[in-house]
Amino acid sequence: MRAFIRIQHSGDFYDQNCYSVYHGCSKLDIPIVRYKAIYSVTDNAPTDLVVGAFSDVKVALERLGVNLLPIDYPDELLPFTGRKIWKSTLFTITSHPDYWHVFVKPVEDVKRFRGTILDKSEDLIKLGGGLEDIEVWCSEKVNFLAEWRIWILDGKIIGVNPYRGRWDLYPDPKVLQQAVNAYHSAPRAYALDFGITDKRETLLVEVSDAYALSSFGLDSVLYLSLIHISEPTRRRG
């Protein structure tokens, strides 16, 4: 195993995630290869790790014939969302103002725009300028005051990190464990994002495979283990 880690033109690591993987590799004596552009990486093997921007990881995996399938909202975990969630298309939502007042995010084309609230016509600019219709997730609005990432490896919670909102609001640990127990189709390495609402409910925000997630301060060796295990186990198209 080698770790291909992106660097800036200055020679510094591309971001905190890249440095975290470098730190973990240093502790475990895993050889690293620095790269500036993903197209210069031509000899990575399926057992190697590629770290960089989301697009870098996507290109590296697609070269190996790996089909990226977002998890988002598994059926087993829908009861933990506490709200209605459904699929639609971007043009369907944007062309019917009576469908607005929802949270919208792409199902697969995640670079098209970031998940956002659509309340008024001024919000349409946040949905990107693409001419192609895409599939989107729609969700009833929830007022999350704080959001936390829960890291899971082989069915066990190995880390919990805050990443948005108030520092003094914590998720209910019983709800977190119940969600892990209920997720029978889970991959080996993944993350659950949970939020605490203005009603002090602990609700699921979304589920993500670990292969391209930000570390959010997780121990570097644990972070390295999570993303390495998740990459080779992606489902193939």
What do these predicted ranges mean?
Residues 18, 217-220:
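Conserved strand-to-helix beginnings and helix N-cap segments that scaffold or border functional pockets
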Residues 147, 206, 231:
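Acidic-residue sensor for enzyme active/binding pockets
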Residues 228-237:
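Single conserved hydrophobic/aromatic residue that forms the stacking wall/gate
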